[in-house]
Amino acid sequence: MSFSSAVKNELCRVETDRSSSLFELAAAARISGLIKVVNANEINLRLVTENAAFARRIFSQIKDLYGINAEISIRRSPKLKKNIVYIIVLTSSKGLMRILEDINIKVSEKVEYIPYARCMRKKEYRKAYLRGAFLASGSMSDPEKTYHLEITCHNMALATEVSDLMDSFKLHSKVTKRKGNYVVYLKEGENIVDFLNIIGAHSALLELENIRILKEMRNNVNRIVNCETANLQKTVDASVRQVENINYIKEHLGFDKLPENLREIAKMRLAYSDATLKELGEMLNPPLGKSGVNHRLRKLDKIAESLRNMKGEL
């Protein structure tokens, strides 16, 4: 089961009062409902979902709120033949007009979605509307791979409505157009966690938080390993360069021409090419700190560079 399906199944177990049920139903019908004007006397509304729990929830809400038994049928998905889709149909002969009036959808020659200001009055109403919107038309990526949550709307006005509701909780949503639809989305993990909390998906929230913590730990470990690897590579490269320069000095100048302190560190570096600066310093008599060792080795680098310049090798 996908993470998105698990979230929806959890949301379908959230208990709601009559008002919250109405706002859930309103969101589902407004955002993903397909309204068809058959003729002057007949209108129908279709809700299509692949989630069986959501289909049962919508069917129950319609019956509890309006005493209507909606028609429900099961089909194979036209896109993915192995998937089942559930189709809930309401008609004007079975009380659809009353529902449309309650959820601010006006049907005459065309379908008009009137701004649904009622759901802005209380926080619980806004939560219920967002829960219904996600159940009807939302999806979420696998958080192991990336953080992305979206709700698809079939017009800009509805997308703006959903975005404004999200932003009333300071979620910083964005809207984009995709294949003729308008998608409201969240990209930040923290905002997605907050959204799941708002709509009541608390188990999914905890799972997402655990995934975020593990990903952050892995990223921190990788950063440390990469940093240590880079530092080790720098140390190795410096040691190789130092050994090459010291051998060049030995061959073209001779150690006897070097001051005692440089001769000592040159021999020590050749003898212990894989030693760190700290280890080299501790082997000297008297011991020398890292900066002192580094200073002497840099002097040897400069001597080698001068010799190469004199011989025209640079």
From Swiss-Prot:
Pfam families: HTH_WhiA, LAGLIDADG_WhiA, WhiA_N. The keyword DNA-binding applies. GO terms for biological process: cell division; regulation of sporulation. Keywords: Cell cycle, Cell division, DNA-binding. Signal peptide: none annotated. SUPFAM superfamilies: Homing endonucleases (SSF55608). GO terms for molecular function: DNA binding. Residues 276-309 bind DNA. The keyword RNA-binding does not apply. Belongs to the WhiA family. PANTHER family: CELL DIVISION PROTEIN WHIA-RELATED (PTHR37307:SF1). NCBIfam families: DNA_bind_WhiA (TIGR00647). Involved in cell division and chromosome segregation. HAMAP family: HTH_type_WhiA (MF_01420). This is Probable cell division protein WhiA. The gene is whiA.
